[in-house]
Amino acid sequence: MNDNFIERAFSLAEEGVGQVSPRPSVGAVIIKDNKLISEGKTEPQPGNHAEVNAINACNEDITNSTLICTLEPHSYHGVSAPCTEAIIKSGIKKVICPIEDPNPKVSGNGFRQLKLAGIEIERNFSPQHIKRAKNIIEGFKKSLVHKIPFISLKIASSIDGKTSTNSNQSKWITSEKSREHGRLLRSKYDAVMTGINTIESDNPQLTFRDKNGNNTGYPRYKIVLDSNGKINEKAKIFDSNETTIIFTTKKNKINFKKNNLEIIEVEKVDGRTNLIEIMKIINNLGIHKILVE
C-alpha cells in the first residue's frame, strides 16, 4: 500500500483533533486501482463519521475498493448508524486500519462484523503508525478509561527554572516561533485552562488566531479556576464567542452574566476549588483534552 494514502488518512484525522469531541477524530480514504478516489473525516455530533463521509463523497465506482481508516469502524447504533453497515453496503472489499477502538461497545467488534461480511482486514502497520494513531485518540481513550480528560501543561521557563523576573515585569522569555507554536497547540485541544492569577496578571484572550489575526473559534472552551470569585467582567477572556467556564466555590458568588459564560460552583478543598470534582465535571461535558497555561 502506498504510504502517501496512509499519510493522507492520518492528516485528515489530525485535522479534526480538538474539534470533534466527545467523538474520536478519524481520517478515512478510499483507494481503487492505486488511486485515491475519495476521503472523509469525522464531523462534530450529530454529523457523520469519517468512513461514511468518504463513502458519501465518492463519485466513482466504489465496488472492490480499499478503505484506509485510522481507527476501527464503529459497529453499534448510537448518535449515528454503524459505520460497518455503510462499509458493507458500499461494496468495499478491504479495510486497512492500525488500531481497535478502545470503546468496549466496539473493541474489535467492528473488525469482526466486516470479516463476517467477507471484507478483508489488514492491520500490518509500523510501530510508528500505531503510536501515531493512538496519539490522535489519546483524549478519547483517557476519558473512556479513566473518566477524566487528558491534560497537557504548557509552561515557558528559563534554563534555571524561572518563569519571570522577580518584579514580574518581564513580558516574554520565549521566541516568536515558540509563542506561535504555543498558540497553535490551543487549536488541538478541546479547552484551554488557566487560573485567576494568570487572568489578572496577563489578561489573555486564550484564543487561536490564524495568520491574518482572525479568531478561529478554537479551542471551543476556555476554563478558569477562580476559587474566590475575583474575575473582572471586563477581562479579555470574554471578548470572543467561545464558551467560557469559570469554576468557583459555593461561598464565592460571581454575580455578572455574559453570553457563552457558564459558572460552576464546586466544594472547596484546602482553600481551593476541588480539582478532582472539576475534572469529572469537565469530562462529563464531553471535554476530553485540556491544555493548561
What is each of the regions a protein language model found here?
Residues 21-26, 63-66:
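Acidic, glycine-enriched active-site microenvironments
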Residues 48-68:
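Flexible, acidic active-site loops/lids enriched in D/E/S/T/G that coordinate Mg2+ and/or position polar
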Residues 54, 74, 83:
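Short cysteine clusters
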Residues 66-76:
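Active-site cofactor/substrate anionic-group-binding motifs, chiefly glycine-
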